[in-house]
Amino acid sequence: MKMIEQHNQEYREGKHSFTMAMNAFGEMTSEEFRQVVNGFQNQKHRKGKVLQEPLLHDIRKSVDWREKGYVTPVKDQCNWGSVRTDVRKTEKLVSLSVQTWWTALGFKAMLAAFLENHYFASSMLPTMEAWTLRKPFHMKKSSGDWKVQGHRGASGESLLASGESQQSPEVAQYSGKHQVQCHLIEEALQMLSGGDEDHDEDKWPHDMRNHLAGEAQV
């Protein structure tokens, strides 16, 4: 609280452009935070490829896919698998409920944020009318469904920026230290909603410049 109060006092003095406040994670330890919000599990992808930067592709200086209606609002789903739709495949942007995701993928899939295991209903209906019940917590996919076909790894920020400027990719972020063995690892499965080359990278809470990321292919 002292840090927050000091920061807000400096904000009133014109030293900062934003204020700070306590949130739901303020009293958690680092381990508790990882257990609550980080569901990504690293795996050896059978269909993984390496993202190649196009030779003739100019990376846009900034892009915000939210302005184009490509990204649904962010949900606070703790360590459950993220729920989102792909407007480029479906021509409509519908925010699916967590209950729909639970019923469609089952308990284990919700806990394991695996890139290549996710699939969605192409109709993107928030109700269960698009699904045929097979047994509790499992669904039979209809003929119109599509799924993630694989991923492409990006070993640097420039490659990730190249992919992100072309579409809004889903990425797996490893934000631990550059060590073979690391016991303090914070990971997450995220949707990049945009980027801006002018933003101050040195002030990021984690060094993202050389971390691995994967772009979901559909």
From Swiss-Prot:
Pfam families to which the protein is assigned, alphabetical: Inhibitor_I29 (PF08246)
Chain spans, region Disordered: 144-173, 195-218
InterPro entries assigned: Papain-like_cys_pep_sf, Prot_inhib_I29
Gene3D superfamilies: Cysteine proteinases (3.90.70.10)
Biased segments, Basic and acidic residues type: 201-212
Family: Belongs to the peptidase C1 family.
The protein's name in its UniProt record: Putative inactive cathepsin L-like protein CTSL3P
Organism this protein belongs to: Homo sapiens
